[in-house]
Every structure is written in structure tokens, then in C-alpha cells.
Amino acid sequence: MRQHVNPLSHFFQLHNELPRPEDLFESIDLPIHLDIGCARGKFLIDMAADNAQWNFLGVEIREPLVFAAEKERIELGLTNLRFFFCNANISLEKWFLSLENGQLKRVSIQFPDPWFKKRHRKRRVLNQSFLFLLAQSLDIGSELFIQSDVISVMDEMTEIIELSHFFDRHSKYSESNLNANPFKFCTEREKYAIHQGVKVYRQLYFRNSTGIL
């Protein structure tokens, strides 16, 4: 079951400043994978343990999950991984400005809170403004991966991304939806959905050469 928090409430509108990359990771010359809405962080913990040539950052709006994820990261001694509590739509813009060109190589948004009621849809994490920030921060060829078990959420994310013209579907995964996760590991939510026989919708994009005016 998803545990929702309202990202538009006053508390979650406060800016939580994320450290600059050089203050986050031991090896700052490695590419960064940013996972937005990382939940308990099991996906990134597995990815970081298996990919020493990448740095990983997970951000999550539910603070207890961040505490648990960061505690496990420390226990495992993973220096190429960090977790932070923040509202991505509020706190990431300034952090993006601290990045060197080409430093952010992959962004994933996996199973975001669906906010089914029409009046609540403005709470969804991916909107046109936030996508514009991602397009500004990702170099040509960098990846954007999305997935959800709610078709209406997936359709909305796909529409926002493709109407922006900043991203193209990855040629290797150009079908309407990916049948399999392109990564070696899954999130907790994906494992649960698969176990329950729920269909998962996915798409992998890369940043194209369309400039930002």
C-alpha cells in the first residue's frame, strides 16, 4: 500500500538544500544516477553495490523511509550512494545548478504516487516545469527512465515527456511499453506488482539534441 504525503502542504514546500556532488561522493568524476521517489531505497542499494563506476542519489518525500535507507547504506559501507529527504519539485532545482556539465547521466521516476482524484493531480511529481528542469540538466544521450503500475499515470508522464520534444525513446526499447525492466534490479513496488500479477508500464528515453530557448 502506498503511504501518501501531500507535497503541496506548507511543510513540504520548504526548501531542503542538498549538498553539492563533491560533498556527497568520494569519487566525484563518476556519472550520477538520480532516482526520484526512491522509497526505501532497495533498488539503489542493489544498483550501487553492483555498479562501482556510478554514483547514485535517491530523493524521497517520506522522511522515515530516507532514515531507514541511509542507515542501511551506512551499514553496507556504500560510498557511491546517498539518500536525502526532500520534495523533488522544490529542492532539486538549486542542486541541478551545482552540477558540472555531463555529470548527471540518468534519472529514474519509478511508481510515483498516482493521486487518482482529478483535483489532486497537480501533486504528481512529473509536470511540464519539472521536465524542463530535467531537460536543462541532462546532456545529450543521458537517460530518463519511467515506470508505473497505473496506466493513467504512465500515459500522463509519457505525454508530458514526448510533447516536450527534449527526449526520444531509446531505439533499443522503442515499443510502446517495455516488457522488461532494462536494469538488473527492481524497486520494492515493482516486485510487489509482479507478485500480484499487476501489469507494469515502462519506457526509457534519452535526451536528444533539441536546444532549450
Curated annotation (Swiss-Prot):
Keywords: Methyltransferase, S-adenosyl-L-methionine, Transferase, tRNA processing. S-adenosyl-L-methionine binds at residues 35, 60, 87, 113. The active site is at 113. It comes from the Bacteria. Its EC number is 2.1.1.33. GO terms for cellular component: tRNA methyltransferase complex. One of its GO terms (molecular function) is tRNA (guanine(46)-N7)-methyltransferase activity. This is tRNA (guanine-N(7)-)-methyltransferase. It catalyses: guanosine(46) in tRNA + S-adenosyl-L-methionine = N(7)-methylguanosine(46) in tRNA + S-adenosyl-L-homocysteine. Pathway: tRNA modification; N(7)-methylguanine-tRNA biosynthesis. Belongs to the class I-like SAM-binding methyltransferase superfamily. TrmB family. Pfam families: Methyltransf_4. Substrate binds at residues 117, 149. PANTHER family: 3-DEOXY-D-MANNO-OCTULOSONIC-ACID TRANSFERASE/TRNA GUANINE-N 7 - -METHYLTRANSFERASE, TRNA (GUANINE-N(7)-)-METHYLTRANSFERASE.
